Amino acid sequence: MRLILPADTEGIFLERKSRFTGVALVEGKKTLIHIHNTGRLPLLKKGKRVLLKRAESDRRKTGWDLLAVEHRNEFVFVHSGFHSIVAGKILEELFPGSTIESEKRFENSRFDFLIDRRTFVEVKGCTYEEDGVAMFPDAPTGRGRRHIEELIRSVKSGFKALLLILVFLESDCFLPNRSVDPAFSEIFWRALNSGVNIDVFRVKYDGEYLCSTEKLSICEEV
């Protein structure tokens, strides 16, 4: 998978003002930027280099969108608004010739994709790691737990289900983040044992392209 998404400029991150806004030094000026990610993003620290894309609308209070933040000699893509686009490209390669529909409803939930009317897909983006282990979530996520519960229910109803996890930073393998959200970790393993397929893909960003480089394994839980 290769998706072109060039950054428009580079800046220096200064602070996170709220859930969706931050301040960065852009072209020598303190500038309000939009952070399209509801996670805690612990790697987003003062002084870090960031890649930004100019906002398409002049009516917004924030003139720039945060795309990526520097972390250990690479840029980690943090804009969750592109997760579905990246996932769609990966699914096209995983299921060539299949019909892939987006935003499909099952009972009281809406999943990211439905493949050939029989496989529901939910996508999660991971931007946190410890000692080479990618972990999700970086903050408690009731919504994430509900999505996986619904994937399990879809399997019990005769569908197939896939949890697709996109890891955006250098990692050796993946684990659910038990220390941050024990309930999510519990339901993750329950899903794996209930017939939900879980695929983890490493996605790199170089300021020009998003590229899916390899499939990661699920670590052995200690």
Curated annotation (Swiss-Prot):
CDD domains from the UniProt entry: SfsA-like
Superkingdom of this protein's organism: Bacteria
MF-aspect GO terms: DNA binding
InterPro entries tied to this protein: SfsA, SfsA_C, SfsA_N
Entry's family note: Belongs to the SfsA family.
Name of the protein in question: Sugar fermentation stimulation protein homolog
Native species: Thermotoga maritima (strain ATCC 43589 / DSM 3109 / JCM 10099 / NBRC 100826 / MSB8)
Organism taxonomic ancestry: Bacteria, Thermotogati, Thermotogota, Thermotogae, Thermotogales
